[in-house]
UniProtKB/Swiss-Prot annotation:
Protein name: Large ribosomal subunit protein uL16
HAMAP family given in the database record: Ribosomal_uL16
Annotated PANTHER family: 50S/60S RIBOSOMAL PROTEIN L16, LARGE RIBOSOMAL SUBUNIT PROTEIN UL16M
Subunit structure of this chain's protein: Part of the 50S ribosomal subunit.
Domain of life: Bacteria
Length: 136
């Protein structure tokens, strides 16, 4: 599972998921999976989608993960009264804005890449679309 090796602070404020995305172009591979909606991906979801893609391409080609879960999400235990401080870190998420390229792929045909990204998209909570590298 992806998570930072070390952080400056253990816990962060909830914040808001606004603004525009960086990393909107396919830069490493030939094909990409781009987010259309806004949301957050957990480390488990990122890994599940990666595994689905890897199996679909039968370990051919190369896959790049363009998102990293760097925000800790805390939860309080069940049946605990409010107050008494912030809960413990339970999992890590990556905040996703529309236009962000989530995964990239190279070394496979377009139809295999489309199939693999469709399987990966089914594992993700944000709407996505298939994109190809634009050559200038």
């Amino acid at each position: 599972m992806l998570q930072p090796k070390r952080t400056k602070f253990r816990k962060v404020h909830k914040g808001r998921n606004r603004g525009i995305a960086g990393g909107t172009e396919v830069s490493f591979g030939t094909f990409g999976l781009k987010a259309v909606g806004r949301g957050r991906l957990t480390a488990r979801q990122i890994e599940a989608a990666r595994r689905a893609m890897t199996r679909a391409v039968k370990r051919q080609g190369k896959i790049w993960i363009r998102v990293f879960p760097d925000k800790p999400i805390t939860e309080k235990p069940l049946e605990v009264r409010m107050g008494k401080g912030k809960g413990n870190v339970e999992y890590w998420v990556a905040l996703i804005q529309p236009g962000k390229v989530l995964y990239e792929m190279d070394g496979v045909s377009e139809e295999i890449a489309r199939e693999a990204f469709a399987l990966a998209a089914a594992k993700l909570p944000v709407k996505t679309t298939f994109v190809t590298k634009t050559v200038m």
